[in-house]
Each structure stands twice: as structure tokens, then as C-alpha cells.
Amino acid sequence: MDPTSRPAIVIDNGTGYTKMGFAGNVEPCFILPTVVAVNESFLNQSKSSSKATWQTQHNAGVAADLDFYIGDEALAKSRSSSTHNLHYPIEHGQVEDWDAMERYWQQCIFNYLRCDPEDHYFLLTESPLTPPESREYTGEILFETFNVPGLYIAVNSVLALAAGYTTSKCEMTGVVVDVGDGATHVVPVAEGYVIGSCIKSIPIAGKDVTLFIQQLMRERGENIPPEDSFDVARKVKEMYCYTCSDIVKEFNKHDKEPAKYIKQWKGVKPKTGAPYTCDVGYERFLGPEVFFNPEIYSNDFTTTLPAVIDKCIQSAPIDTRRALYKNIVLSGGSTMFKDFGRRLQRDLKKIVDARVLANNARTGGEITSQPVEVNVVSHPVQRFAVWFGGSVLSSTPEFFASCRTKEEYEEYGASICRTNPVFKGMY
């Protein structure tokens, strides 16, 4: 059967989580932590020159090579077994362990999606600052190991913009604020093309919010088991956190009416099974505040997210700036905090308006600058924006014509994966 008649497979590999499913669906079929548990016990066996011992070690190595788990199964296995070590293939948006990444894809395709890779075209995502060599490695693994008929590697920011376009009827010109678990990127896109020289990234992302909440609760002396503290902080972030408009007023509200604003987390200790409770107070608004006042978390980076977005747009070509300010699209789970988009739009609008007023003052009122419209777009599929954008675009006929095929790979080599064309469905 012709692979183009089957739905393409869309896999969005993130630092924290991987989303995977079939083109045409609204939501991914599976969302798994991007982690691999590998049995490395054979490495600790004593080395010996005897043939029998070597054969034993070799057989153990082969068995261990096949004995691995991914996602939640990997996390559970590492807790229950001392022989399995965790490997995180992706760090800060970049693949660092290609062996673990190949194993991860293997399980995704055969164990979860349960499909034959030779029967489907594939769309994979990458970070905006990914080097071309990384695309070549991806192409080699997909074409040689899995023998896929076609592959398209898309920049996740373009897919997020496509998701905003589909749900909000916006242009394919805009700024994507992609806040993932391990990296935050601000990417300007003009008519489907990334303006590479203007990409900005900041070293604060979803995992940093979790670590900050964990630190706050630890300093307050909450009764949380050490081995469970990170997971509790992550769940507190996802369930209770919100973005406030004024941090001082928020402190006052919590102090005046603690019963109204302080929540209680109930958990079970992993080792003993005994129940425990802890209070969740200032963490609810201080967690997301690191994007707007980063100095409360780290002295190494103090530039706010609105200032980074403004700097990104100001470095773009002058004829695209108004369109970029008008379409700022949010993407990623860490943009899902309540009122995050509203706070971002307000703070960015202040920066832009202050520049306009300063410009008018410099000209003495002889030349008046036109107001700049600032619009931050939130949409229903914001959390899975990258995957949903890939699902929509890989459902179009133009997608199959734009993919790098197995025949092209065999003729020209992995270098064909260095670039992927923008196709008509993107704009």
C-alpha cells in the first residue's frame, strides 16, 4: 500500500516530554517523559581473558542491550530496580545521547504507536538552534535503522505558529514564545520562514520553575520526603500555580486571607506508604514570576521575558516589526499558567509604549509615532501547539511532496536532511 495514503506519524521530542501520534488528530496519542532506563549491570562484571567469561559477558551485554524501558515505565523501573540507570537523551532542547534517542524512537514506534515505520511518512521536530549535523544523525537513524519512506524535520516554532494560524486565523508571520521544560526560545517567523539571526533564548524554562518551587518548599521546612520533592513541586506547578499582576499585592492577599489562598497538598510517602500533607502558599504565584522577575530565582540572568521578546522583534527587519508585535503566539506547557498571556501582553505593551513616548519627546512633537498594537495569542491547543501544528501540516498533500524520501537519501546521502523546504500548507 502506498505510504502517502496512510496518515503520517508526528513525533515531537521535547526535553521533558515527547508527544506522538498520527496526522489529522487533534491531540497526540501518547505523552511520555523523554527518558530511557537501560540495564547496565553487565558493565560492572569483572573483566577476564578466559573465553567462557568473555562469552558470559557478551551474552549479558546483548540481553542488557534489549532490556530497556522508556517514559513512565523507565521511571518506575529505576525506582524498583538497582540495575537500570536513567538516561535523558535531550538536554536544553538538543539531543545529547544518540544511542538513547534511537532506543527511545524504537519503543515509540513499535511499542506505543504499534506501526510499521516502512508504511508511514514521518514528521519530527527540532529546536530552532539545532545544528545541521543533528539533522543528519536523525536522517541516518530514521532512514537506515527504521527504513522510513519519507522524513520531514520541522522547526517547532513554525509548527506552533501553524497551530495558532489554524485555531485563531492569524498570519504565518509572528513571534513564537516556546517555553518548554528545558529551554525557552523566542523565534520570529516571517511568512513561514524563521528569521534565524533574531532568535533569542533564555536559560529559564519549565524545569527551573519546578526547581524554584521545590527550593521554596524546602526552605520553609515542609514535610515532604526528599525522594518525592521534585515530583510534588512539578504537580504543584501544574495544579496550583498562576500568574499575578502585582507581586506585592499578592503577598498582602495571602497574608490577610491565608485560608482562602493557601492550598494543601496531600501525598503518600513512597517508602512507608504513610500519608502526609503540606501547605502550598507563596509558591503558587512566585513560580511563574521567574519569567517576569528572574532575579528572584537566579542572579546569573536578570532580563525579563517581555524584554527578551521586545529585543527579538527590534532586531528583526523593520518592515516586519508591526506584524510581529501583532501576533505573539504562546507555545508549551509552561505558558499554561492562568493569566500568563495577559501579564506578558501588559508588560510588553509598557515597554513598547515607553519607546513611542520617548521618540515623540525627542522629536518635540513635530513627528508623532503611530501606536504599536501588541497582541499575545492564546489558543485551545497551546499546550500541544507544536504537535498539533505538525498534525495539521502533515495532513496536507504538499507535505508528502516536501519530504525527503528514502530514494533521495540513498542517492545523495544524509546531507539532504540539512534543510527542509517551506511548503504551501504553511502559509
UniProtKB/Swiss-Prot annotation:
Recorded phenotype for the gene knockout or disruption: Distorted trichomes and altered epidermal cell types.
GO molecular function annotation: actin binding; ATP binding
Annotated compartments: Cytoplasm, Cytoskeleton
Major subcellular location class: cytoplasm
Membrane-traversing stretches: none
The entry's keywords: Actin-binding, ATP-binding, Cytoplasm, Cytoskeleton, Developmental protein, Nucleotide-binding
Keyword hit for Mitochondrion: no
Tissue expression notes: Expressed at low levels in roots, seedlings, leaves, stems, flowers, pollen, siliques and at a higher level in inflorescences.
InterPro entries: Actin, ATPase_NBD
SMART domains: ACTIN
Keyword Hydrolase: no
CDD domains, A to Z: ASKHA_NBD_Arp3-like
GO process annotations (BP): actin filament organization; cell morphogenesis; multidimensional cell growth; trichome morphogenesis
A single cellular component GO annotation: Arp2/3 protein complex
Pfam families documented for this protein: Actin
Subunit text: Component of the Arp2/3 complex composed of ARP2, ARP3, ARPC1/p41-ARC, ARPC2/p34-ARC, ARPC3/p21-ARC, ARPC4/p20-ARC and ARPC5/p16-ARC. Interacts directly with ARP2/WRM, ABI1, ABI2, ABI4, BRICK1 and SCAR3. Interacts with ARPC4.
Similarity comment: family membership: Belongs to the actin family. ARP3 subfamily.
Protein's job: Functions as ATP-binding component of the Arp2/3 complex which is involved in regulation of actin polymerization and together with an activating nucleation-promoting factor (NPF) mediates the formation of branched actin networks. Seems to contact the pointed end of the daughter actin filament. Arp2/3 complex plays a critical role in the control of cell morphogenesis via the modulation of cell polarity development. Involved in the control of cell morphogenesis in leaf epidermal pavement cells, root hairs, hypocotyls epidermal cells and trichomes, especially during rapid cell expansion.
Name the record gives this protein: Actin-related protein 3
Organism listed in the record: Arabidopsis thaliana (Mouse-ear cress)
